[in-house]
Amino acid sequence: MLTRYLAKELGPRRIAVNTVAPGAIATDFGGGVVRDNPHVHQAIASVTALGRVGLPEDIGGAIAHLLAPESGWINGECILISGGMNL
């Protein structure tokens, strides 16, 4: 809701506002639980359509896409990056 509000408010200034909502990512966040605990890692991988836990590069690639000039028409969107965990 905030993303869309800000996109509408800032759109006339030619400022696009988008957000990303990452799923489970293997990082140091949370003490590295997803990355370092094989049971947690497997449990998460088993409920994603892609069958794996996300990597920081997965999120970075989506953000790089949003920053590219070719994405200039994307505005007010929250992009879920979860490997299909929510399907």
Question: Model-flagged regions — what are they?
Answer:
Residues A16-A26, L67-E70, L80-S82:
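Conserved SDR Rossmann-fold cofactor-binding beta-strand/turn motif
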Residues T48-I59, E70:
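A conserved structural motif in NAD(P)-dependent oxidoreductases
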Residues K8-P12, I25, G54, L67:
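A short hydrophobic alpha-helix cap/turn motif
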Residues G11, A16, I74-G76:
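Short, small/polar-rich loop/turn modules that mediate ligand/substrate recognition or access, typified
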Residues T3-R4, G60-I63, L67:
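Short-chain dehydrogenase/reductase
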Residues A64, N75-L87:
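Short C-terminal tail/terminal secondary-structure segment
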Residues M1-E9:
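Conserved catalytic helix of short-chain dehydrogenase/reductases
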Residues P12, A24-V47:
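A glycine/serine/threonine-rich, flexible loop-to-helix segment
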